[in-house]
Amino acid sequence: MDAQQLIETWQLNNRINLYLLDAVSEEHLADALLSKGRNVGEQFAHIHNVRLMWLKAAMPEALRGFSKIEKSGIGKPLLRDSLTNSAAAIEQLLAFAVGNGGRVKNFKPHVTAFVGYLTAQEAHHRSQIIIAVKQSGHALDKKVLYGIWEWGSR
């Protein structure tokens, strides 16, 4: 396993999240799926909050200075800072896991699967965000919709 490639994959995933966040206007953070559930801002917050949940379970010392994003007062600056910082903390967890037998505490089977799990979870929420914006009548630019798949240029 190449530790650097694993960490770079995680970094790419987060850059895709930030790319999508940048494409959503502040007022569209309130857009929600027709089937209810979280709005766009809450979806981004959930991504951050799930990272914190895993840090608490696997590397609680990395949680210092972090707080969960609550439903009220969600704005793009808070989301950008939170996603950037929680991604860096997950990166620390990955580096630690790679250097300590490839295991993430409280997750099976190994660190590579953990990156796959987090990436899949976050990609699911990116799709929820895109659908919510579209269903609310605020289509994202096609460049962005294709751009989230261009990992080689992110």
PLM region spans:
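Short, contiguous alpha-helical
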Residues: 7-11, 15-21, 28-68, 105-154
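Acidic catalytic patch
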Residues: 92-108
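Basic/polar N-terminal segments that are highly enriched at the extreme N-terminus
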Residues: 1-4
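Helix-adjacent hinge/juxtasegments
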Residues: 56-96
